[in-house]
Amino acid sequence: MIVNELLKRYAAGDRDFEGLDLQGAYLSKVNLPGANLRRVDLRGANLTGASLQGVNLSYADLSKANLNGANLSGANLEEAKLEATDLRKANLIKTNLKKAKLTGANLKEASLMFANLSQANLDCADFHGATLHQAILHRASLRNTDLIGAILQETDLRGADLSQACLIRADITKAVLMVADLTNAVLLGAELQGADLSGATMPDGKMHD
C-alpha cells in the first residue's frame, strides 16, 4: 500500500491496517496513534519521530527500522521483531514488549519506564543511558547487553539472563534479581543498594545467599 493512501484512510477514520507490507516505507514524523498495525511488515522503514501511542504492533516485523525519537508509549509490541532496530531516545513508557526480539537493537537513552519486557530477547542490545525504572524484565535474555549508566531502579529482573552484560555505573537500586544469572557480568561502579539478589549467580559464578 502506498503511504499516502494509508494516511488518507487514517484521516478518514480507518484504524485497521493489519498485515500490510510497508517494508522500507518512509513514515518519518507520521501520526498514527491507536492504529492496528498487527503483523505489519515494517522492515527497514523510516519511522523517526513518529507518533505511535497505543498502536497495536504485535507480531509486526520492524527489523532494522529507524524509530529514533519515536513515541510508542502504551503501544503493544508483544512478540514483535525489532532486531537491529534503531530505538534511540524512543518513548517506550508502559509499552508491552513481552517476548519481543530486540537482539542487537539500539536503545540508547530510550525511556522504558513501566514497560513489560518479560521473556524478551535483548541479547547484544544497547541500553546505554536508558531508563528502565520499574520495568518488567522477568526471564528476559540480556546476554552481552550494554547497560552502561542505565537506570534499573526497582526493575523486575527475576530469572533474567545477564551473563556477560555490561552494567558499569548502572543504577540497580532496589531491583529484584532473584535467581538471575550475572555470570561474567561487569558491575564496576554499579549501584546495588537494596537490590534483591537472592539465589542469583554472581559474576564470579558463585550463588548469592
Model-flagged regions — what are they?
Residues 2-209:
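Tandem repeat scaffolds
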